[in-house]
């Protein structure tokens, strides 16, 4: 356990930030799972709405520092290819 006031404060800040990052990561992963399920399911309209929501959440995760911008870009590119393949049939 930290003894200095500044170390105690940093520990508190770390707990707060960890909880916030965990919530944002969980929200993002849930949305990704929903999109992948929709792609596997088949309804093209649902896939498009899920995709737009997923892209929005990925961009928000980048803004909040949860994801690196290149990681989010990679996710979006791969998901976009899967959505395009699914909706073009």
Swiss-Prot record:
What GO biological process terms does the UniProt entry carry, in alphabetical order? translation
Q: Where is this region: Disordered?
A: 1-28
A GO cellular component annotation here is: cytosol
Alphabetical UniProt keywords? Ribonucleoprotein, Ribosomal protein, RNA-binding, rRNA-binding
UniProt-listed InterPro entries: Ribosomal_bS20, Ribosomal_bS20_sf
Task: Report the superkingdom from the record.
Answer: Bacteria
Question: Which Gene Ontology terms cover its molecular function?
Answer: small ribosomal subunit rRNA binding; structural constituent of ribosome
Q: Which Gene3D superfamilies has this protein been placed in?
A: Ribosomal protein S20
What family does the entry list? Answer: Belongs to the bacterial ribosomal protein bS20 family.
Q: Mind telling me which HAMAP family this protein's record contains? A: Ribosomal_bS20
Q: What does this protein do?
A: Binds directly to 16S ribosomal RNA.
Q: What is this protein called?
A: Small ribosomal subunit protein bS20
């Amino acid at each position: 356990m930290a003894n200095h006031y500044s170390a105690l404060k940093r520990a508190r800040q770390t707990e707060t930030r960890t909880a916030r990052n965990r919530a944002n990561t969980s929200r993002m992963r849930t949305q990704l799972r929903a999109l992948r399920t929709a792609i596997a399911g088949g309804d093209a309209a649902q896939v498009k709405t899920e995709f737009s929501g997923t892209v929005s959440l990925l961009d928000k995760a980048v803004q909040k520092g949860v994801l690196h911008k290149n990681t989010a870009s990679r996710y979006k590119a791969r998901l976009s290819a899967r959505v395009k393949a699914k909706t073009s049939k």
